[in-house]
């Protein structure tokens, strides 16, 4: 069930009263029933036709960029994250039903009797493993970001609902800048200027004020999830990081809203320092996008086989163990690097006139065209825990616009 506009809302029957009688969730896509459903919901296929291989060179070059819009949820953690986070979204909305007395108390500032404890979930993994893309797919699977309700069960319900608020943690993040970011983003979604400047005008660090204003945003617009990406950036803040984390704990406990965090393993180390969050991570879900440690890894094999279907060279080649070994060797299992090499190898084959890719094309493309990535990939090849801890920074440097 997908709505096509703000006003096009279809409330469905699930035969569960806590869902059907709640206007905040009766229209949402239900959590997947099983692993296969989760796989289908998460997958993102680039537009492709085998006849594309006969198109002019300039068009095929353009179409290769479609691999940027590709996601294959081959890792079991991908599916667990979708099932877990979408379930938490529903769990969080159930006690906030605005048609119930309890939900009305929460809406108008009273202390709601929230029996389902809010959770904090973490999606962690190396840079390039697809954390942000997984978040994109999980959120899109739930429904639209914003809905304008009108009537529910023949009762007026002229409410604007924001399903999620998602922000990247800036490198110099404070509670104030984080709240200001959420306020400005809410204005952007609504197309209004309700919260712009509220947080900037506050001097000092009045935690109660910040909580009060964020509470207004969450309750007034029925926000279902708070999502924070690039959470590892807090590691640059020293003592200030603890204040931001403490603020998130307050949000979770006082507002009853699930929070989803994504970041590298630095983010995990930041959160592990708070026992309350560590406990909640176990309850809410820790989704580790572990790097495959060999070309034999089942999820990596499946990923390569699915991606290999998207070839825009004139001559199609079949996937083989040698090709998978080559893709692993040049990427060390990092999804983003593997897809970049695959796309670049196709461009190389088109440019040199061979019009076919194989394991040799992959290795040559990596060696000649992707030298900025070599230091980062060599770190992973070293298998040294001390060096691997520096991989994310090395990859970030390689992808920086100022590189080379």
Please provide the spans of the model-predicted regions:
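Mid-core helix/loop region of P-loop NTP-binding domains shared across ATPases and GTPases
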Residues: 101, 112-116, 158-159, 174-181, ...
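Post-Walker A helix-loop "phosphate-sensing" segment adjacent to the P-loop in P-loop NTPases
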Residues: 141-154, 188-191
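The catalytic "switch" region of P-loop NTPases
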Residues: 215-225, 235-237, 245-322
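Walker A/P-loop-proximal flanking segment of P-loop NTPase domains
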Residues: 1-119
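Hydrophobic positions on the alpha1 helix immediately C-terminal to the Walker A/P-loop
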Residues: 134, 138
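Hydrophobic anchor at the beta1->P-loop junction of P-loop NTPases
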Residues: 123
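C-terminal alpha-helical "lid" subdomain
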Residues: 1-49, 65, 220, 293-404
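Conserved lysine of the Walker
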Residues: 131
